[in-house]
Regions:
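Short linear sequence motif anchored by a di-proline
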Residues: 1-232
């Protein structure tokens, strides 16, 4: 699953410009976003495309208790079949901007965080689906996950779907039928992402500052983790 990600203000602005969104959402850089966080989400076709604040954790329209029914992720392999996701896939697709995301390696009973971000090029346009919050609150969304790319596979078997620019345009086009878009939900090619072992501060969701991205140092941080995974 994808359980934490980073969004820097400058990356948000860059991706919104790429997607043709004129109104830049009010947002301060955050370095440890987790389910239930309120974050920018892009939806709709050009030229009426907008960025809105939405809550991570999709609440199905039939949920009796929204707080207990949040779905942070939807698997690409089953998103078209599951009742909780099927209608959103057809009618309510979105892109969630991200600078990068975290995954954890389990080693000796310890959780060691790794940060994955593009080596170069634009920020990540993560594929999502959303539901209207109605009178109860903001829209809610789930990130779609797929099998891991090579840089990630040694740590975790899943990753969020990151869409290239043309794929992001197709994903946001309501005239595109969902079955035609399913082939877009695939891993990134090898070499796109850089992997860095980072501070265990990110293990605690209350830590949201830029120090979450500091490289792991000292014996307690196991600074040789990058060599051990062959991801240098």
């Amino acid at each position: 699953m994808c359980g934490r990600y980073v969004l820097k203000r400058e990356d948000l602005e860059a991706l919104l410009r790429q997607l043709g969104v004129q109104d830049i959402a009010a947002f301060t850089s955050r370095y440890n976003l987790a389910p239930t966080s309120l974050v920018p989400m892009v939806r709709g076709p050009r030229p009426a495309r907008t960025a809105v604040t939405a809550q991570w954790g999709l609440v199905p329209p039939w949920a009796a208790t929204p707080g207990g029914s949040r779905l942070a992720n939807a698997r690409a392999e089953s998103v078209a079949a599951r009742p909780a996701f099927r209608e959103s896939l057809q009618r309510r697709r979105c892109v969630v901007p991200a600078s990068g995301f975290y995954e954890w390696e389990t080693r000796g009973g310890r959780k060691l965080p790794w940060y994955f971000t593009p080596r170069d090029g634009p920020p990540l346009a993560l594929a999502g689906i959303w539901n209207d919050g109605g009178d109860a609150g903001p829209a809610t969304f789930a990130l779609i996950t797929t099998e891991a790319c090579p840089e990630l596979a040694r740590i975790h078997d899943r990753m969020p779907v990151a869409l290239p620019p043309e794929a992001a345009e197709a994903w946001l086009d309501p005239d595109q039928p969902a079955p035609a878009l399913l082939p877009l939900l695939r891993p990134l090619p090898a070499g796109v992402l850089a992997a860095t072992r980072v501070s265990t501060r990110v293990n605690q969701v209350r830590h949201e500052g830029p120090d979450c991205l500091l490289p792991a140092t000292g014996p307690e941080e196991e600074a040789d983790g990058q060599l051990g995974l062959g991801l240098g």
